Amino acid sequence: MRFINSSFTDAGFNLAAEEYLLKQGTEDVFMLWQSAPSVIIGKHQRVETEVNRTMAEQNKIPVFRRFSGGGAVYHDLGNINLTFIETTRLARFETYLERTVEMLTAAGVAVRGDERLGIYVDGRKVSGSAQCVHRNRAMYHCTLLYDTNLVLLNKLLEVEGLEEKVAVHLSLIHISEPTR
């Protein structure tokens, strides 16, 4: 497995690198990366229902769409992003969660994973993930919050008037879990 420790903090660059490595690469890859403040939404999400655009514009925080599913996430230099890309006949995304939990446990962090592939410390969600498959290649990527600006995270991912939009766009809204 090839290890890539990306020194680029542009979320758009790192997301494009993931997509290239998945679709054009042949090697199995483990990539670590961080992003300057940014919001990343899933492939099937609507910006209007996931991101407080006014807050993003006021803080000059770009919004990117990734090519995998999953919910909206906030990135800054206080979180680490992990990407696993492998050639496989059968993608078992739980395996990547297990690897991440084992790594954190070995580092002395008491964590637990759940059936939705989230990771928790003391009952608080510190990691969410998204997955996708392209031909015979699978990708699992996740965030790991450790010193993230949670005030900004919660303001950016809190959309006013969402209740009215839920009835119209229910299929495009993710199941949110508060990050404390």
What kind of feature is each model-predicted range?
Residues 135-137, 142-172:
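Phosphate/diphosphate-binding glycine-rich loops and adjacent basic-rich segments that engage nucleotide
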Residues 1-48, 131, 156-158, 176:
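Active-site loop/lid in soluble adenylation, ligation, and acyl-transfer enzymes
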Residues 171-180:
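Residue-level detector of conserved catalytic or cofactor/ligand-binding positions
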Residues 74-86, 137-138:
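DPxDG-like acidic metal-binding loop motif
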Residues 90-106:
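Long, well-ordered alpha-helical scaffolding segments within enzyme catalytic domains
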Residues 45-65:
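Short, His- and charge-rich active-site/binding loops that engage polyanionic ligands
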Residues 113-131:
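Beta-rich nucleic-acid/ligand-interaction surfaces
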Residues 59-80:
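A glycine-rich, hydrophobic loop/mini-helix early in the fold
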